[in-house]
From Swiss-Prot:
Source organism per UniProt: Methanospirillum hungatei JF-1 (strain ATCC 27890 / DSM 864 / NBRC 100397 / JF-1)
The family this protein is said to belong to: Belongs to the CRISPR-associated endonuclease Cas1 family.
UniProt-listed Enzyme Commission number(s): 3.1.-.-
Alphabetized PANTHER family for the sequence: CRISPR-ASSOCIATED ENDONUCLEASE CAS1, CRISPR-ASSOCIATED ENDONUCLEASE CAS1 1
Cofactors: Mg(2+); Mn(2+)
The protein's name in its UniProt record: CRISPR-associated endonuclease Cas1 3
Role noted for this protein: CRISPR (clustered regularly interspaced short palindromic repeat), is an adaptive immune system that provides protection against mobile genetic elements (viruses, transposable elements and conjugative plasmids). CRISPR clusters contain spacers, sequences complementary to antecedent mobile elements, and target invading nucleic acids. CRISPR clusters are transcribed and processed into CRISPR RNA (crRNA). Acts as a dsDNA endonuclease. Involved in the integration of spacer DNA into the CRISPR cassette.
NCBIfam families reported for this sequence: cas1, cas1_ECOLI
Gene name linked to the record: cas1-3
Amino acid sequence: MTPTLPDIKPIPIKERSSVVFLGRGELDVIDGAFVLVDTNGIRMQIPVGGLASLMLEPGSRVSHAAVSLASKVGCLLVFVGEGGVRLYSVGHPGGARSDRLLYQARLALDEVLRLKVVKKMFSLRFGEDFSDAYSVEQLRGLEGVRVREGYRKIARDTGVIWNGRRYDPHSWGSADLPNRCLSAATASLYGICEAAVLAAGYSPSIGFLHTGKPLSFVYDIADLFKFETVVPAAFKTAALNPREPEREVRYACRDLFRETQLLKRIIPTIEEVLTAGGISAPAPPDWVVPPAIPVDEEG
C-alpha cells in the first residue's frame, strides 16, 4: 500500500510575510490557487499561506472558497476602509485555545494582576522599571507626555512639519500628509499584531490598558512596537512627499517588518507581558467533557 502524504500544516506565524493590502478585485480559488481577479479579468496569484494577514479595502470581494482556504492556512482576512483606517470585519483564522483565553481573562479581571501586566507593558515600551507604586492614571499621563514628545522628536529628525496627531476616519482626505502616513502605517501594524494574537490563542478584544474595543489587546501589543517601527517609517515616507503616500508607507512597513523580523518577536512578547501577572494558565477540571470531534477532523 502506498503511504499517504502527511497533512500540510500552516506555516508558523514567525516565518510568514507580514501583510498585503488588496482592493478593487475579487478573491477566489481557481485551479487550486488563491488569486485576485481584477475588473479586466487579469489574475494575480496571492501566496495566502505565507501571509500573516490580508487587508481588504473597498472594492474587494471574496468568494466562499477563498475564505475557506484562508482559514485553513491561517491567514487573517481583515475588511478595512480606505487606507486601512476603519475596521469593518475580521475573518477568524482559527487557533484560539480556551485555556489561553481563560488565562487572559483571569489576568484582565483581577485588578492586581492586570496592573502588573500594564506595568510590564510600560517597562518594555519605555525601558524603565515601573514596578513601584504607579496607578493606571499616572501611567496614562506619563504615556501621553512621552508619546507626544516621541512624535515631535521623530518629526524633527526627519524634517517633517508636525502639528499633532489629528485625523477624521470619516474624511480620509482631510488629514495632512504625516497623519495619513501614520494611519496607513499603524493599520499595517494592527493587522500583523491581530494575526499574532489569534495565532497564539488569545482574544484580540480582552485588553489591559485599552478596553471596550474589538481590538483592545491588539492595540496594547502594537503600542509596544509602534515607535520603533511604523512611526519612523511613516515620517520618513512623509518627508519624501510621495504621490501615493499610503502605498509607499505600506511598502516601507513591509520591508521594515522583514528587516526587524517583527513577526518572530510578537508572540514571545505577548507571552512575556502576560507572564508578568505571575500566574499560570488554569488547568481544566478532571470532570470536563473533551471535544466530541477533534479539531483536525472537523469538516
